[in-house]
Regions:
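Fungal secretory targeting signals
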Residues: 1-23
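Sequence contexts marking disulfide-bonded cysteines in secreted/extracellular proteins
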Residues: 36-38, 70-77, 164-166, 170-172, ...
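Extracellular Ig-like/FN3 beta-sandwich strand-entry sites
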Residues: 94-96, 108, 150, 166-170
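Internal, hydrophobic beta-strand segments that form the core of beta-sheet-rich folds
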Residues: 116, 153-182
Length: 195
């Protein structure tokens, strides 16, 4: 029995949590995500909502139900707007938006919070907030000295978005973190509109 348990324990250690947005409610998986990305990707995200993105392309490619033209795993882990219509936030230009992030396992690197056009997967304007280096530093994390502004912060909705983000599903606020040593990307998205 022990030889069977050890590989499972090792696997569990590789899929343990890393980070995600806690508030406002981030995109989550559902039927639309299964239809676009396949069950393998959705199961991976459901089993560990904070896992890194790098394992998803391989899972997607091996799933016969994966539709590359509908599921961009590098944007919100492929999670679809259609599963999150009840979670759309409405903001106004200039509004300050409080965001809370969970960091479970640190990997020092860089991070940013940006508004992303979901059709083109491009950042609109400049990042709303950026940590060019030193984000999620292991030494600080385990010493319980992680700067508070890495997990609880406010971003301001730009006043020059025009109508770009007036339709639900057109834009997301994306928290993006790259752990340099681990070479792993973590991301979480908030659906929103600007009224």
């Amino acid at each position: 029995m022990l030889p069977q348990i050890l590989p499972l324990a090792a696997f569990a250690a590789t899929v343990s949590a890393h980070g995600l947005i806690l508030s406002p409610t981030p995109r989550g998986p559902g039927d639309a995500s299964v239809a676009a990305c396949g069950q393998s990707v959705v199961d991976n995200v459901k089993n560990d909502k904070t896992s890194h993105v790098e394992g998803l392309p391989e899972l997607a490619a091996a799933d016969p139900d994966y539709k590359a033209d509908e599921c961009n795993v590098w944007l919100c882990k492929g999670l679809q707007y259609g599963d999150n219509t009840a979670n759309v936030q409405t903001y106004t230009a200039g509004q300050s938006v409080p965001i809370e992030v969970q960091l479970s396992i640190p990997h020092v690197g860089s991070a940013n919070v940006s508004i992303v056009d979901t059709k083109t997967d491009t950042i609109i304007g400049s990042p709303l907030l950026s940590w060019p280096s030193g984000y999620a530093d292991e030494r600080q994390f385990y010493a319980h000295t992680t700067p508070a502004n890495q997990t609880k912060f406010n971003v301001t909705i730009p006043d020059d978005l025009g109508t770009q983000c007036s339709e639900a599903g057109a834009c997301v606020i994306q928290w993006w973190w790259y752990g340099t040593g681990a070479r792993q990307t973590y991301e979480s998205c908030i659906d929103f509109t600007v009224a």
